[in-house]
Amino acid sequence: MANPAGKSGKIETGDETRMKTIGIIGAMSEEIAYLKEKVEIVTTKNVIGLDFHVGKYCGNSIVLVISGIGKVNAAVCTQVLIDHFGVDYVINTGCAGSLNEGLGIGDILISTDAVQHDMDVSALGDPVGTIPRLAESYFKADEMLIKIAQEAAAESEEEYKVILGRVASGDQFIGTKEGKERIKKYVQGDCAEMEGAAI
């Protein structure tokens, strides 16, 4: 496993007075199984029916959790990570469907931003993806975490393509060409999945 914090091992922000706590969310057990093997799990706490695995990896405190599928589950899980575990960062990991012709099976997309492709109030005049009465509808990823993810991917010995791009999230499994084309047209997503924009 490539070191998620790059060569230094720890996520460094300039404020090194305490260990950073990283929450890592996967919607399904398959999406965090590999990480569970690598993280030194110290304890498991059950909150709202979810098992939060607390441990350490490369000098960071880690909280691993399976949120369940969909945006509501992901949002609730994220709030628990913040309220109960005081995480400094939240990382969403998992599988997605490619909307970018340059991405193949096993390739990696590092999110630059995320949008809800199924948020549609276009009948009221807003573009698809726009959340009414909210200042932002496209949620930007943390630039420091993007850089760290790129460095970790570059250190890996695995052979796969890594690109930066937009995550398009919705509470639906996209299984048709028409569905893919709609997301590309309206929100310019590079991949489609079911949790990221809610985290």
Task: Briefly describe each language-model feature range.
Residues 31, 37-43, 83-84, 104-115:
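A glycine- and small-aliphatic-rich helix-loop capping segment at beta-alpha/alpha-beta transitions
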Residues 193-199:
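Short glycine-rich, acidic/polar surface loops and turns
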Residues 19-79:
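N-terminal short beta-loop-beta anion/metal-coordinating cradle
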Residues 99-187:
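Mid-sequence, gly/pro-rich, charge-dense loop/helix-turn segments that line enzyme active sites
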Residues 3-10, 15:
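Short, positively charged and aromatic/hydrophobic N-terminal segments
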